[in-house]
Amino acid sequence: NWQGVSDVEVGSNAFNLDDYNQTNGDTGGMNFYDDPYNTTTKWNDIWTFTEQATTAVDGIRKSPAMETEDRETMLAYLGEALTLRALGYFELVRWWGDVPFKENAASSDLSNVYIGKCDKDTIYNHIIADLKEAIGYLPWQGKGTYNAERVTKGFAYGLLARVALFAGGWSVRDGNTFPDLKLEHHPTIAEMNGFFVGRPKNYQDYYQIALDACADLLADPENPHQLDPDFEEVWEKVNHLELNPYNENLFEVAFGEGQSGDVGATMGYTLGNGVTNASRGMGGTGYASTTLYYFYSFDPEDKRRDVTCAFPSYEMVDGVAKETMRLNPLGVSCGKWRWYWMTDEYLQRLEVATSRISTGINWILMRYPDIYLMFAEAQNELHGPTEVEARTGLSAAAALEVVRTRAFGAGSAKVKDYDGSSKEAFFNAIINERAWEFGCECI
């Protein structure tokens, strides 16, 4: 899930000259000097996940239970499988662009396994269709056993919007392998050796798909999702292995304490070796961190800043546990994961740990503010920042301000302190807001 070097996060040892050529994990792939073919575990794991989801789709569609009284349950399972397959292919395309694509599970004779690359537009169109189908089958979060650890209707809407925005956006294109695609070339980025930055000529159709997905979710009276009024509580709850009471988290990858997951153990607030009775520390910048430059991009009154960026480190100094401050400008800890928010059971295990203990902290793949910001982006692109969308009663600017209101507090003048003077200026405001809202979440 780690996205390597971005404008917000820094991958493990991202600027270390000695790690760029590692091939036995993804550390090399996160490095600034990276060889992109080093991302072996990510490539293998996402393909395995995607193939398993495809197998589930095939099996459910062919299941005799689809013709019984269990049909509604089976359709919900189908919606989950379609969404997970879409997620898998989306991650593959996001990382590697044009990749092999097939709608059916691998055949026993391997006749559909060794296939060539498919252009990303075709893949996007397939998974957009899958997600539209899935939305019709999936229950809302909170219905029966469907909580944030299961794929539900809200996440399918959100993933549809995310995929559509990528599909309609600019990306690197291979004009050598796919010369016949109807694409618009970027006006200011030059072509090089047949590769260019382009987007579909009908890109606005994809923005409309994204807008519809967000608006339909926001306007649905059965929609159970809200923003948690307290930004810090979002992270206290997930660290404490609790589901968010406002259903802010549309989907969490589920882990189990002592069984799986190292979120918080290899990233987050730093607890040095020997601070507890254990010889093993936790937190720090092992998987991902951020930078001092990102910290200073925040408004000082933004409540998200001191939750997202953490400088303290608890270390043994002359035999005494002391709070010190991290001074590396490229190694600021991700504060959304903190050992003192974790469960008592986990902290008791930590007291005697000699090796890493799985924290069980779920990985949040999408939160509800993403819906508001994707709505704002799509509405702005199609209609500008101030025109009101009929289903939601929101303009792009109003949607942005929903997110900023939590960050600064209702009534704060800072809520409207952004440049919305033009479509282009407002787009840049959304880019900045996404960085401040989702920092260290590696999305």
Predicted regions and their residues:
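An aromatic- and glycine-enriched ligand-binding surface/loop that stacks and positions planar moieties
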Residues: 1-24, 97-99, 103, 124, ...
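Conserved, well-structured interaction surfaces
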Residues: 17-96, 111-148, 335-366, 371-374, ...
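Extracellular structured ligand-interaction cores
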Residues: 76, 83, 98, 151-158, ...
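Structural recognition of the beta-strand scaffold that forms the well-ordered cores
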Residues: 92-94, 100-102, 249-253, 365, ...
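Acidic, serine/threonine/proline-rich low-complexity intrinsically disordered regions
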Residues: 105-106, 114-117, 171-208, 362-367, ...
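Carbohydrate-binding/catalytic loop surfaces
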Residues: 110, 232-258, 338, 344-349, ...
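C-terminal structured "cap/appendage" subdomains that terminate the fold
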Residues: 382, 396-443
